[in-house]
Amino acid sequence: MERKLSEQEEIRRNKIAELEKNNLQAFHKTIKPTANSKELNEKYKNLSREDLDKQNLEFVFNGRIMTIRGPFIVLQDNCGQMQIYANKKTLNESSAKTFSLMDFGDILSVRGTLSKTNTDALVIKAQDIVLLTKSLKPLPDKFHGLVDPEERRRQRYVDLIMNEKTRNTFVMRTQIIKGIREYFDSLNYIEVDTPILNPILGGAAAKPFITFYNALNRNFYLRIATELPLKKLIVGGLDRVYEIGRIFRNEGVDTTHNPEFTSIEFYEAYSDLWGMMERTEGVFKHLINKFNIKEVKFNGFDITFNFPFKRVNMIDAISEKINVDIRKLNEEQMFELAKKHGIKIEKFFRYGHIINELFEKYVEETLIEPTFVYGHPIEISPLAAIDPDDKRFTLRAELFIGTKEFANMFTELNDPIDQLQRFENQLLEKENGNEEANEIDWDFVNALEYGMPPTGGSGIGIDRLIMLLTQNDSIRDVVLFPQLKDLK
């Protein structure tokens, strides 16, 4: 297919021919750098020009051209930027020719001595310049940059070149995930990998992506959670496990939801809901201390991290908002209450579904500071242990910050008879139109029948956590390559 090139693209391609005519390459073999911008600045920024010139320190520095101002070039590497001074009179012939054919965006290797400018900035005085990679497309100009959010996400490679905030966000993302691993490794958890393709839908209430497994001649689901295989490992005697990995949910996209996202789930034998609240809070405390974060702006709110996090009962919070003690209502009365509050009743709804709708309508928007909400209804918690004080509810909690859910945890249901009944109830919901209801995972039931110790488990959405700690407004700004609509 013929491509229409811009004038700049034509000019740059013509320069390749000019380079070749002078026995120079537009795409050179690699040359190893001997220092990066961070190392040079940390080690030499406090030395005077006289001291540097006296030492005659020679380095090879590689980077992308971000600025050309007469004999001065600014090269950018993965740590920052470095000025280069290229005096054509002192360059050899090939370097001088290379210099004359350079463009904004080209990648160079420069050998030279370290000095300082009149403004006391470090500079490498070039002795030899080699073009490593010719940039055939012009970068956005530095003044206007790449500002359109959609374009930045679509061409993340250009965004990373042009925007320091983007680079810092994704470096921070890596550091946050390392920090999460540090926390769990220090508590003697072991990291595991479980299957992404699953024959059974389970572990969360979500719509799946479905694929066909040719070798087995049947449909499989991309996992919507890692819960069930991780709990099988608890049965097997691995008392503390965690997994960081991709989850796939075939649902909507907004500023805090992406169908492909990263999460951590962790499970601990001989723990419970309250232990999981402490562990989940511990993750946040570890990261906040590690990165010295005092407060953040998230979802339009100023968030301060005060430990321990606030804890509220779901039923108490709803009752306070609507001025009705819903604990005293039976299912029929709950349906009447739902109609009064304009809640659409689905065919599969029962007592607990209405509680959840009331919570989402009246309470979620009030949860600004970090808050654990506990005591979820059994109908929406098919994998959580029952509350022995009121069997309509479970030992489950969610962590909310800035009105958004960040974590989900419970005392795990380890009664195989009760678990099978819950799965069967989920099938009835599916028959009545609940597309997010779970299927029966017979192998999981089989595992529970061997005996799972009392266990606590929790899951945290890592992308949303990174949004919070890096103060980004959209999940698509903390995912390197988010899925976007096709260009028309």
Swiss-Prot record:
<keyword id="KW-0648">Protein biosynthesis</keyword>
<dbReference type="GO" id="GO:0004824">
    <property type="term" value="F:lysine-tRNA ligase activity"/>
</dbReference>
<dbReference type="GO" id="GO:0000287">
    <property type="term" value="F:magnesium ion binding"/>
</dbReference>
<feature type="binding site">
    <location>
        <position position="405"/>
    </location>
    <ligand>
        <name>Mg(2+) 1</name>
    </ligand>
</feature>
<dbReference type="InterPro" id="IPR002313">
    <property type="entry name" value="Lys-tRNA-ligase_II"/>
</dbReference>
<dbReference type="InterPro" id="IPR045864">
    <property type="entry name" value="aa-tRNA-synth_II/BPL/LPL"/>
</dbReference>
<dbReference type="InterPro" id="IPR018149">
    <property type="entry name" value="Lys-tRNA-synth_II_C"/>
</dbReference>
<dbReference type="GO" id="GO:0005829">
    <property type="term" value="C:cytosol"/>
</dbReference>
<comment type="similarity">
    <text>Belongs to the class-II aminoacyl-tRNA synthetase family.</text>
</comment>
<protein>
    <recommendedName>
        <fullName>Lysine--tRNA ligase</fullName>
        <ecNumber>6.1.1.6</ecNumber>
    </recommendedName>
</protein>
<dbReference type="GO" id="GO:0005524">
    <property type="term" value="F:ATP binding"/>
</dbReference>
<feature type="binding site">
    <location>
        <position position="398"/>
    </location>
    <ligand>
        <name>Mg(2+) 1</name>
    </ligand>
</feature>
<keyword id="KW-0030">Aminoacyl-tRNA synthetase</keyword>
<feature type="binding site">
    <location>
        <position position="405"/>
    </location>
    <ligand>
        <name>Mg(2+) 2</name>
    </ligand>
</feature>
<keyword id="KW-0436">Ligase</keyword>
<dbReference type="InterPro" id="IPR012340">
    <property type="entry name" value="NA-bd_OB-fold"/>
</dbReference>
<dbReference type="InterPro" id="IPR004365">
    <property type="entry name" value="NA-bd_OB_tRNA"/>
</dbReference>
<keyword id="KW-0963">Cytoplasm</keyword>
<dbReference type="InterPro" id="IPR004364">
    <property type="entry name" value="Aa-tRNA-synt_II"/>
</dbReference>
<dbReference type="InterPro" id="IPR044136">
    <property type="entry name" value="Lys-tRNA-ligase_II_N"/>
</dbReference>
<dbReference type="Pfam" id="PF01336">
    <property type="entry name" value="tRNA_anti-codon"/>
</dbReference>
<dbReference type="InterPro" id="IPR006195">
    <property type="entry name" value="aa-tRNA-synth_II"/>
</dbReference>
<keyword id="KW-0067">ATP-binding</keyword>
<comment type="subunit">
    <text>Homodimer.</text>
</comment>
<keyword id="KW-0460">Magnesium</keyword>
<dbReference type="GO" id="GO:0000049">
    <property type="term" value="F:tRNA binding"/>
</dbReference>
<dbReference type="GO" id="GO:0006430">
    <property type="term" value="P:lysyl-tRNA aminoacylation"/>
</dbReference>
<keyword id="KW-0547">Nucleotide-binding</keyword>
<keyword id="KW-0479">Metal-binding</keyword>
<dbReference type="Pfam" id="PF00152">
    <property type="entry name" value="tRNA-synt_2"/>
</dbReference>
